[in-house]
């Protein structure tokens, strides 16, 4: 028998009352947690994501934060147009669209041989390259060392950052930061809202966050990817050179590689610090120019912008183990090194599939931006002691599997 109208109304009122009180309880509890824990950055994070129907950071977050502007070059490098016509196959197009690709560009030498955009993303659109910015920071470190502002790769961090002069931190060097082997206790999770990564993205005190980290293992022993290392490098550059990071980036690289558009770097607050571990916004074509600089081992128009010795050192992988307990073949001085194919690929990488791939043997640069990526190739638990399996896949482990597809597409277009 169905409920009478009066009983139904009472039931609806009761349901709404319980729902309202539940929501009120959750809001009060969340606010109490934020206030008592001091994690006020969560307000910014919630307002920038969940209240806008998003679950996390996106490539178009530029106006969510205050930012610095890095002016484009006065002498723009014009890409030549390829005389040949290339296109994606239906299968490749489907692959790109399934991963919400926003741009895919292929350059060979001085020529732009393929360029495609999706949705509202166009050639003038700037997007966040996320952690691909880490490699940009590394190039700036190389310049600062070569010019004598930073003494050497093996200079203690404490020379520039006072909080690292005492205790276990005084053993950490610039090289350790670049190799992601500092031994610091940094929470890198991109999904955990309570991680150091989340606080660094939405918070307003980057210096306080990175200098308060504790040492939990001996530096230089294990590869452990941490965005805090990159941020410390940025502070070292500023302390050593006396210049703001964005100004230094403009003077030493961005103005010298023929960039066509301004770039933007998110700050932690008004007149604050650049989020050097991520959050550099630029156009896909300008990211291609950065890839070309890497491809040419730091040289542009016959001039050595980044020292050659540093570019060669940058792509070496040190004799240390990864978290899987295998030799590190994947990461040099803040640059990814893929040696699982026929020829080496050196690349900048950011979450959600931001890539600037340089393939020296093909004189090739590939830029991909978008909002999704595939998972990293990881070591299955049951294969950890299988030496044959490890030998076969050790140079692919830790790389996102989609780069293999992008490399394949780029190489197909240059045959």
Regions found by a protein language model. Give the residues of each.
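Short, small/polar residue-rich loop motifs at catalytic or cofactor-binding pockets
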Residues: 98-101, 125, 351-352
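Structured C-terminal helix/loop/strand segments within mature extracytoplasmic catalytic/sensor domains
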Residues: 15, 31-40, 48, 348-415
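N-terminal leader/targeting segments and the immediately adjacent pre-domain N-terminus
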Residues: 2-121, 150, 398, 403-415
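Active-site-proximal alpha-helical segments within enzyme catalytic domains
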Residues: 229-236, 276-299, 354-371
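Active-site helix/loop module of the DD-peptidase/beta-lactamase fold
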Residues: 147-185, 212, 239-278, 282
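Active-site Gly/Thr loop motif
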Residues: 261, 315-365
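A small/polar active-site loop signature that marks catalytic segments
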Residues: 186-268
């Amino acid at each position: 028998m169905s409920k009478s109208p009066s009983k139904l109304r009472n039931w609806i009122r009761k349901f709404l009352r319980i729902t309202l009180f539940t929501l009120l309880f959750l809001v009060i509890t969340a606010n109490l947690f934020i206030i008592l824990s001091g994690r006020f950055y969560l307000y910014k994070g919630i307002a920038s994501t969940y209240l806008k129907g998003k679950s996390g950071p996106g490539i178009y977050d530029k106006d969510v934060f205050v930012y610095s502007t890095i002016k484009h070059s006065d002498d723009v490098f014009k890409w030549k147009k390829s005389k040949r016509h290339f296109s994606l196959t239906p299968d490749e197009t489907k692959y790109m669209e399934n991963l919400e690709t926003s741009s895919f560009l292929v350059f060979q030498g001085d020529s732009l041989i393929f360029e495609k955009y999706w949705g509202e993303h166009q050639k003038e659109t700037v997007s966040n390259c996320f952690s691909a910015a880490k490699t940009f920071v590394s190039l700036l470190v190389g310049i600062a060392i070569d010019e004598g502002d930073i003494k050497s790769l093996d200079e203690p961090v404490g020379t520039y950052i006072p909080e690292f002069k005492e205790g276990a931190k005084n053993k950490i060097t610039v090289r350790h930061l670049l190799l992601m082997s500092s031994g610091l206790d940094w929470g890198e999770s991109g999904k955990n809202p309570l991680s150091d990564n989340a606080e660094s993205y939405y918070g307003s005190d980057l210096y306080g966050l990175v200098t308060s980290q504790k040492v939990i293992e001996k530096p230089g022993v294990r590869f452990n990817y941490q965005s805090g290392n990159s941020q410390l490098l940025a502070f070292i550059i500023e302390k050593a050179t006396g210049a703001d990071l964005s100004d230094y980036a403009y003077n030493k690289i961005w103005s010298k590689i023929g960039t066509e558009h301004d770039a933007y770097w998110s700050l932690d607050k008004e007149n604050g610090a650049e989020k050097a571990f991520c959050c550099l916004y630029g156009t896909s074509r300008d990211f291609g120019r950065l890839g070309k600089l890497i491809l040419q081992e730091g040289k542009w128009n016959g001039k050595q912008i980044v020292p050659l010795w540093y570019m060669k050192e940058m792509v070496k992988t040190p004799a240390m183990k990864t978290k899987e307990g295998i030799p590190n073949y994947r990461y040099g001085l803040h640059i990814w090194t893929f040696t699982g194919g026929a020829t080496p690929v050196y690349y900048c990488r950011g979450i959600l599939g931001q890539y600037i791939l340089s393939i020296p043997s093909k004189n090739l640069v590939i830029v991909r931006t978008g909002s999704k990526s595939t998972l990293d190739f990881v070591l299955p638990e049951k294969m950890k002691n299988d030496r044959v399996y490890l030998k076969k896949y050790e140079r692919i482990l830790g790389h996102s599997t989609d780069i293999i597809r992008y490399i394949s597409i780029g190489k197909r277009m240059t045959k």
